[in-house]
Amino acid sequence: MKIYKDYSLLPYNTFGMDVKAARFVEYDSVEELTGFLAGHEDVFPCLHVGGGSNLLFTADYAGTVLHSAIKGREIVGETEDWVDIRVGAGEVWDDFVAYAVACGWYGAENLSLIPGEVGASAVQNIGAYGVEAKDLIRFVDTVCLETGCRRRFANEECCYSYRESVFKKELKGKYIVTHVTFRLGKRPAFRLDYGNIQAELGGAEPTLEGVRQAVIRIRRAKLPDPKLLGNGGSFFMNPVVPAEQFEALAQRFPDMPCYPVAGGRVKIPAGWLIDRCGWKGKSIGRAAVYERQALVLVNLGGASGKEILQLAQAVAHSVKDKFGVTIAPEVNII
């Protein structure tokens, strides 16, 4: 276990905010985590970070920041059709996807190149190109911050919805994810009807590696490398509206794209809404809307978290004024 005071969080947020944590704790086992919680009464306020790809710090953090270095992958169940694999929360997400593809297991390939760590996938319900983490997750193993007790959540207990989970709502800040068990398929099953994966494949017969590489090419063409240009990926969630509201909008904006979702509702791409408001490539101070993808806000260099937030609020206000639609941040603002 590593414990530091006044520790820079620059390596733990992809926006490139050089803020500090009053205390930073990194653990590499459940036992180390529970031991720390049992031995320290001053844990709170507390924040758990992974790769920091979904965080925007607007100031130094006055409490304890925890980071998991729990690694490992273990097959815990298997049949001719599927495999259950339990993965440490500190594993890099895309490393896990690459491993699954190399093993010939289906399900995670559309989630290639999403930044962050495995633990965050279960909290954020990450998703891309028609696939969400909830489609693969069977169990989420956790530790309660208040009691140090372990608890396993089955998929249905996680209350997953679009970019949401019980860990972001009712139980926010109460449990730390230590391991996630995924069920992946052994028989060919691709999801190619979302985005332009089919076009990127160019008519070739889909393979696991082929789909993975197609997704990687698409993402790299759209999204900036945070090592070169600080960003948190998609800053806003795609809004979901009632069908009646979408139909009214479609009368005014016939070219508005949409995706039907459960419950007779419609998902609208937030990037399209932002682009139509004229924000692509625009900036406030050193914070800007990425010129290739309006859904992404970037740090041009030296931007503060407050500048990024100011830009985000201005963008959301414009979308609300023009379309009457509220776009909410996908990024966790601290």
Describe the predicted segments one by one.
Residues Y4-K5, L10-T14, L55, R150-K306, ...:
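Phosphate/pyrophosphate- and phosphate-bearing ligand-binding catalytic cores of soluble enzymes
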